[in-house]
């Protein structure tokens, strides 16, 4: 048994050389689009009609209304209407491709173009593991999950609210989360959007970690604001949008849509609604700061019309992504959408097939930034420790898939045919020996041995293997390097702002 485990460890060590370890994935295959030119024209015309005839509400923020009014939009109370083509004209200043810089330059990522990123789940108040079950998340969980994502090569981004640390007061949670992303990882991360001062704090912490001038001149934060579908942007999201736009940081406009309740029950109508909401909101970003990085985002989950609950891994969810990506390309914006979503409460077969369906659909659609790619359980109410490493394994496989096939002369292996001849085998061929470490992708989570091997090694189910891997990763974790002066500045900022906000020491 010991020998078998030793062999497995050696195989994993060798296969690690074959893993995707670049900061992001470069696609070398085409995308799947389910919308033709005639349908595109119809959806775009319908979005224009929605904005022209119905309009969109921008609530609770007089400055936003004044910005639109001064630019020539039609403002009536909090309702703003736009002439056809007006929003597209403003959106043209947004970059098609840009770089989000990480604290470690080697981990900076391209957003848009042929780049694809896998990002953690966002926002769950609960965590789950197979030993302790479901429970409220704490800042300790936040730290552990950030360490996991830092250690997983297949995860390209540290994320944002990977879990909600409910043991901390709400007004200071953003400080601890940004501090964790900056000190426990050196991958790029997401900014706070729940209040303007929290956005400003996040930007300031990045200035401490990466240099004021650098942050003022480059994109270092990727932040998501959600519309309140249908056709509403509320004051909280508007405040965050304005802060990040003025700072030249990336803002993703992602309508949160539960199909059948927050949009009509058809994919076609939902596409028009989402396009309208994104165009109006990105136009605002470009009015505030032309050229500010902006991203077309979506979160679409059809409701079960029997129970009223969101559903995941559905045909309609994938169809929607495979159309929305084309609409984003037409606007010249990078595309952000969802990955491994599931309604399952534990990392079981339902979690596997729903997550794989949604994740594969996102990859084939060509989504540039795949959020919720790891960890989702219970429709994003929960992040699962085991689910994180299980999903990351699928991300690694799909990253290998989109790199395409090697058709080089070496890959043709003609000398191997001559060496082996008819009736032979290739296991000992020179070509095999030269390429066996990189020939086929080999994951960490699947058991491919015989039944006898599996039994001898404990008969572990996948969630058992995942639990062991989580413990191993956390045991072996080493924090990325950070200058002691920068670390002290971040610690001091956290302590000072905590005292200013709460009157208590951190």
What is each PLM-predicted segment?
Residues 2-14, 18-40, 48-52, 58-73, ...:
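N-terminal intrinsically disordered, cationic/polar leader segments
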Residues 57-65, 76-79, 156, 216-217, ...:
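Flexible, glycine/charged-enriched surface loops at secondary-structure junctions
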